[in-house]
Amino acid sequence: MKNLKKFAFLAILLCLFIPAVSISQTNPAPPAMPTQQNKIIVDKIIEAAHYKTYVVDYCLTKINEASAKEGWNDQKAMEITESINYKNFRDAIYNIFAFYDEVELETLLKAYEKDTAYQTTNIMTTNKVLLNNLDIFARDIVKGKYISK
């Protein structure tokens, strides 16, 4: 009986201390990003595809819709409009190009620069993940999450 109490006590101690010592979950991996050289090429692609303008125009459209729907005054609409900062969304764009190598990016850049029709139906306006991220970004802007106080 005495040995049974010792084993029960040891079992309880093991059940309490092993989970406390071991790490059961780790932090998620950071999002994939292209190399510095590839970021330069991606920036050129963004410029050639006029995607920065697309992001800002999309956000302005969402702001105008919310302003009309909720009856914002001019000051609030202006404050929210001024909070649009493309740099807050740039990492989402870099992420979709993270798995392209330099040759693929250069080929894509040449296609954007050469064919203006290609710019309107480009990977950035047809990528569902990026469009979803853009929609979330625009909603956050409308909610005022990027207003600096």
Predicted region positions:
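Short secondary-structure junctions and interdomain/linker hinges
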Residues: 14, 52-53, 87-88
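Compact alpha-helical subdomains of small soluble proteins
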Residues: 70, 75-149
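Extended, non-catalytic scaffold segments that flank or surround catalytic motifs
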Residues: 6, 15, 148-149
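Boundary at the C-terminal end of the N-terminal hydrophobic targeting segment
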Residues: 22-24
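Bacterial N-terminal signal peptides that target proteins for export
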Residues: 2-10
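Bacterial N-terminal signal peptides
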Residues: 10-19
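Early exported N-terminus immediately downstream of N-terminal targeting peptides
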Residues: 27-79
